């Protein structure tokens, strides 16, 4: 639009103000092929690797669809394939057709090629081809992360399995660390109350595994459990149009192939109800709302329990008995 403004001693001049909205679903290239990214008040030229990562982030390029050059069907895990066939009521002899339909296998020049999604979902050892495809669980004694001589890790487990089996193993690990509290009800019976609603922490795990940016090498999913909270740290920023502010209502899958297959396994609902229900379940347990943030190049979810309040009430009960 045009408007007039005074330019020092030159009087009023007509200038044109042009507002260009950022492109969220494509990457703009110059005529010479160079790509620039606006950061603050500077336009930075991207390297080839940075440009590829931007294409992944914008959905222009999909990491899960890339071919894993050295992988063959023999690198896939028979146990996971059999389980998938049972879930889909498919004979083992036709499992290849199903994997092709889902995008785990691509046929190129008449040759079967395994995709990154195929390796992540069904690989015998996914980290052989994608080293970052693992989850590390850390249990700390206390509410802070000690270092050096003050290190306070009491449990440290790393899981490297095809994603459906990885989720099952991680669910067992997390469940084994959850506390139960007993309270005396009005009818004189003791009632057990879990530390966190199961759906909330399980959805945090599933989302971290399903939606992380697997193109980022050298980073892996970390789940840290303290006395007062659980932290889920997943590599990569929130994808495309999703922000910390609209995450409850906006759905966008960075890895639609992985999401679809994990939905077939029963892990993902694909109805955009997961994050909403985390908020609802935490509220129903009288716990603080979940906290989403983007520290560094990661997405973090923090679930807080009410151990401090429970300790305070316990202390009050002891004092009252004295």
Residue ranges and their predicted role:
Residues 8-72, 216-219, 269-272, 280, ...:
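Intrinsically disordered, low-complexity regulatory tails
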Residues 199, 203, 230, 256, ...:
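Feature representing long, continuous alpha-helical segments
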Residues 38-217, 225, 233-251, 274:
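Active-site helix-to-loop segments that bind/position phosphate- or nucleotide-bearing substrates
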Residues 230-264, 309-319:
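Glycine-rich/acidic phosphate-handling loop/turn and adjacent ATP-lid/helix
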Residues 16-19, 119-121, 136, 222-224, ...:
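Structured core elements
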Residues 10, 140, 187-200, 222-229, ...:
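A glycine-rich phosphate-binding loop feature that marks nucleotide/adenosyl-phosphate handling sites
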Residues 2-7:
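Short, small-residue-biased leader/transition segments that mark boundaries at the very start
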Residues 175, 179, 209-214, 237, ...:
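Hydrophobic alpha-helix feature that most strongly marks membrane-spanning transmembrane helices
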């Amino acid at each position: 639009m045009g408007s007039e403004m005074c330019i020092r001693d030159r009087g009023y001049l007509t200038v044109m103000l042009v507002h260009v909205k950022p492109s969220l679903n494509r990457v703009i290239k110059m005529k010479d092929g160079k790509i620039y990214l606006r950061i603050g008040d500077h336009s930075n030229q991207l390297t080839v690797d940075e440009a590829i990562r931007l294409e992944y982030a914008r959905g222009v390029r999909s990491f899960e669809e890339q071919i894993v050059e050295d992988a063959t069907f023999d690198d896939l895990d028979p146990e996971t394939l059999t389980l998938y066939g049972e879930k889909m009521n498919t004979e083992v002899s036709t499992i290849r057709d199903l994997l092709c339909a889902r995008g785990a296998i691509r046929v190129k020049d008449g040759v079967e090629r395994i995709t990154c999604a195929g390796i992540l979902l069904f690989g015998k050892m996914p980290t052989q081809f994608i080293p970052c495809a693992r989850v590390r669980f850390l249990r700390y004694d206390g509410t802070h992360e000690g270092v050096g001589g003050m290190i306070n890790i009491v449990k440290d487990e790393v899981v490297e399995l095809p994603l459906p089996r990885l989720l099952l193993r991680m669910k067992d690990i997390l469940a084994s660390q959850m506390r139960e509290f007993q309270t005396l009800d009005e009818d004189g019976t003791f009632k057990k109350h879990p530390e966190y609603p199961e759906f909330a922490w399980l959805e945090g795990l599933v989302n971290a595994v399903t939606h992380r940016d697997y193109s980022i090498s050298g980073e892996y999913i970390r789940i840290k459990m303290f006395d007062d909270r659980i932290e889920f740290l997943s590599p990569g920023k929130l994808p495309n149009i999703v922000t910390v502010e609209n995450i409850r209502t906006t759905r966008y899958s960075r890895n639609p192939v992985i999401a679809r297959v994990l939905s077939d396994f029963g892990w993902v609902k694909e109805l955009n109800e997961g994050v909403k229900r985390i908020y609802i379940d935490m509220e129903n347990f009288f716990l603080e709302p979940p906290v989403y943030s983007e520290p560094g190049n990661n997405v973090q979810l923090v679930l807080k329990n009410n151990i401090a309040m429970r300790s305070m009430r316990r202390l009050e009960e002891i004092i009252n008995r004295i």
